[in-house]
Curated annotation (Swiss-Prot):
The keyword Transferase applies. It catalyses: crotonobetainyl-CoA + (R)-carnitine = crotonobetaine + (R)-carnitinyl-CoA; 4-(trimethylamino)butanoyl-CoA + (R)-carnitine = (R)-carnitinyl-CoA + 4-(trimethylamino)butanoate. InterPro entries: CoA-transferase_III, CoA-Trfase_CaiB, CoA-Trfase_fam_III, CoA-Trfase_III_dom3_sf, CoA-Trfase_III_dom_1_sf. Homodimer. Catalyzes the reversible transfer of the CoA moiety from gamma-butyrobetainyl-CoA to L-carnitine to generate L-carnitinyl-CoA and gamma-butyrobetaine. Is also able to catalyze the reversible transfer of the CoA moiety from gamma-butyrobetainyl-CoA or L-carnitinyl-CoA to crotonobetaine to generate crotonobetainyl-CoA. GO terms for molecular function: L-carnitine CoA-transferase activity. It is found in: Cytoplasm. The keyword Protease does not apply. It holds the Pfam family CoA_transf_3. It is an enzyme of class 2 (transferase). GO terms for cellular component: cytoplasm. It comes from Escherichia fergusonii (strain ATCC 35469 / DSM 13698 / CCUG 18766 / IAM 14443 / JCM 21226 / LMG 7866 / NBRC 102419 / NCTC 12128 / CDC 0568-73). This is L-carnitine CoA-transferase.
Length: 405
């Protein structure tokens, strides 16, 4: 297979990934492959571009490094072109409502007839099967969080609240990426393709597991946090200093002992409620939990963030300032690791945003291209799989493909 023009880089160089999906979850899966060196083809509807394009800046990050194909993959010759593309594809990711592709005739079995080694990742809100009530429903970030038990655990004691920005989309997209790579590893051993059913609510169920395990195995419901503080443990969570906010984790025998000296509670060490060797202070079960919070709040409020960070570094207590977005660029750790970078958009503008992550030492990822325009690479992709200029023009004339204007 001849690859589309692009630099060779990263741990996934030579891999062809195709995805069909809009907005965040499915495309995020594909875009991670693209930043790690895979050749990634983004399929868009012919008549309507991906709705993410209406956003002024985010698409320049979420669709960088991609090849844009505008094709009606469900109809006539457009379907034929799509299936021909699948013959040279390693991984196909689709994000839709339940078994939407199967309902329209593109089943796993049809895809495997064209490529027996194909890895297929289906990403949906409620999965490819289950009850009719749920399987075909649309789902976004908040839907998956609400249905999974994740949302009810977040927010304040007075009201649950979703975790933003779009947590379920990113967790689900990354799950699709890792699952597809796991499947590909097995396919290369067996030469037999794989189909993966990723339900967003199940991803969030797994991500929300920590406190739920106490309910499943004992009926204990975890309370939601109060003003950003850990629902169970004193000295853990969000706290206000004289000039802003920090997060901290008061964990460890020595850390608790030294911190208690600073906040005037050293006399509690070694009591039945806080015996020697205590590593965490339970804010509910320990009768002194509220007092610890009260004293810690007062001590922190009387000190600046810089003073707190300096003292906690001496005590080996984990803490960090809650950075504002404008503070990120100048933070020395961000600068040292080039966590924020710049790249050129297709129309020549400079775009700034997060760099490729994680950092591979021997085969690093890179940004080689901005977001392509709608249908920008349609002709090149179709030529790559054997279509002539006349074939492409015929698809365009029938409304089955769109090429760049």
């Amino acid at each position: 297979m001849d690859h589309l023009p692009m630099p060779k880089f990263g741990p996934l160089a030579g891999l062809r990934v195709v995805f069909s999906g809009i907005e965040i979850a499915g495309p995020f899966a594909g875009q991670m492959f693209a930043e790690w060196g895979a050749e990634v083809i983004w399929i868009e509807n012919v008549a309507w571009a991906d709705t993410i394009r209406v956003q002024p800046n985010y698409p320049q990050l979420s669709r960088r490094n991609l090849h844009a194909l505008s094709l009606n993959i469900f109809k006539d010759e457009g379907r034929e072109a799509f299936l021909k593309l699948m013959e040279t594809t390693d991984i196909f990711i689709e994000a839709s409502k339940g078994p939407a592709f199967a309902r329209r005739g593109i089943t796993d079995e049809v895809l495997w007839q064209h490529n027996p080694k194909l890895v297929i990742a289906h990403l949906s809100g409620f999965g490819q099967y289950g009850t009719e009530e749920y399987t075909n429903l649309p789902a976004y970030n908040t839907i998956a969080q609400a249905f999974s038990g994740y949302l009810i655990q977040n927010g304040d004691v007075d009201q649950p609240m979703p975790a933003f920005p779009y947590t379920a989309d990113y967790f689900s997209g990354l799950t699709a990426t890792t699952a597809a790579l796991a499947a590909l590893h097995k396919v290369r051993e067996t030469s037999k393709g794989e189909s993966i059913d990723i339900a967003m609510y199940e991803v969030m169920l797994r991500m929300g597991q920590y406190f739920m395990m106490d309910y499943f195995n004992g009926g204990e419901m975890c309370p939601r946090m109060t003003k950003g503080k850990d629902p169970y443990y004193a000295g853990c969570g969000l706290y206000k200093c004289a000039d802003g906010y920090i997060v901290m984790e008061l964990v460890g025998i020595t850390q608790i002992a030294e911190c208690f000296k600073d906040i005037g509670l050293a006399h509690l060490l070694g009591t039945p409620e806080i015996p020697e060797g205590t590593q965490l202070i339970h804010r509910i079960e320990c009768s002194y939990g509220p007092l610890v919070e009260e004293k810690l709040d007062a001590w922190l409020a009387a000190h600046t963030i810089a003073e707190v960070k300096e003292r906690f570094a001496e005590l080996n207590i984990a803490c960090a300032k809650v950075l504002t977005v404008p503070e990120l660029e100048s933070n020395p750790q961000y600068v040292a690791r080039e966590s924020i970078t710049q790249w050129q958009t297709m129309d020549g503008r400079t775009c700034k945003g997060p760099n490729v992550m994680p950092k591979f030492k021997n085969n690093p990822g890179q940004i080689w291209r901005g977001m392509p325009s709608h249908g920008m690479d349609t002709a090149a992709i179709l030529k790559n799989i054997g279509y002539s200029e006349n074939d492409i023009q015929e698809l365009v004339s029938k409304g089955l493909a769109k090429v760049e204007d």
